[in-house]
Amino acid sequence: MDTLTRFLPEHLQQNQLPEALGGVLLSVVSACTEINAKVRLGALAGVLGMAGTGNIQGEDQKKLDVIANNIMIDTLKANPAVAGLASEEEDTFVSAGENGRYLVLFDPLDGSSNIDVNISVGTIFSILAKPEGALATESFLQTGRQQLAAGYVLYGPQTQLVFTFGHGVYVFTLNAENEFVLTKENPKVPESTKEFAINMSNRRHWLPPVQQYVDELLAGETGTRGKNYNMRWVASMVAEIHRILMRGGVFMYLQDKRDPSKPGKLRLMYEANPMALILEQAGASASNAYQAMLDIQPESLHQRVAVIMGSSEEVDYLNRLHSK
């Protein structure tokens, strides 16, 4: 089986991609390998619990949020090809290599609310080309279609790296020697599914299209959809999307009635766009209920967005309910 270091040069050459772009991916992987070691030790390393600080989103930070964020920033700033970074945990962008050609955006520890109870978490990342001119916030505000690469590392029962350069999706598993080994090429998400993922505790806040959709799913084979569905909910986007990538399903985190000014909870740049690129490469769909996720023009670094992702039959159906 190919290791990442053997696979990557050949993949870059086959698809006429710059070696420096592969180097940025390797920097991300190096950082994630270090984060993995911290996650694995947990309480033994004293890294669990709250940090006593908050991020730009107004969310309380866990110790591992801060640790993972610092590891990502320090590792990526050491790569001269990286011009700038944007993190879910930082107020604004971070400048890096003066002559760098790439921008990296990331959620250093997605699902960190689960870390103290030993449920899977992960790191999500996106790589963009740096536009000409001085680095500014606007440099990062590119659509998801402009991503050069996207991926995530899942810290679960196995530690797995999933990424795409826009030429298929590849899954690597970390072995005992701390090397990522290719274990799956080009997974495909089935068009139809019998699984859905949503936080049912928010049901009373949902908008009518979501209420109708979930009611139809719960009606089972005697309802309008004509089949029985199972619900899943981990409260860790990386874990939810990885399950969908491996066996299908649909994941939803949508706008609701609690705050009409807030389109959703998840971040477009750090979470939705990278996951959308991976899923589209695997034959799935992703939208904000009204347009394809990858076509949304971002207006700010920390922009939130409604999310529907997964098996295209379900995404398309829920999109149609929103358009009525």
UniProtKB/Swiss-Prot annotation:
Residues engaged in binding Mg(2+) 1: 88, 107, 109
* A Pfam family matched in the record: FBPase
Give the subcellular location.
Cytoplasm
Q: Per UniProt, which keywords does this protein have? A: Carbohydrate metabolism, Cytoplasm, Hydrolase, Magnesium, Metal-binding
The cofactors it requires, by name, are: Mg(2+)
Q: Which reaction does it catalyse?
A: beta-D-fructose 1,6-bisphosphate + H2O = beta-D-fructose 6-phosphate + phosphate
Mind telling me which GO cellular component terms the entry cites? cytosol
* Keyword rRNA-binding attached: no
InterPro entries associated with the record: FBPase_C_dom, FBPase_class-1, FBPase_N, FBPtase
Organism this protein belongs to: Neisseria gonorrhoeae (strain ATCC 700825 / FA 1090)
What is the top EC class of this enzyme, as a single word?
hydrolase
Task: Please give the name of this protein.
Answer: Fructose-1,6-bisphosphatase class 1
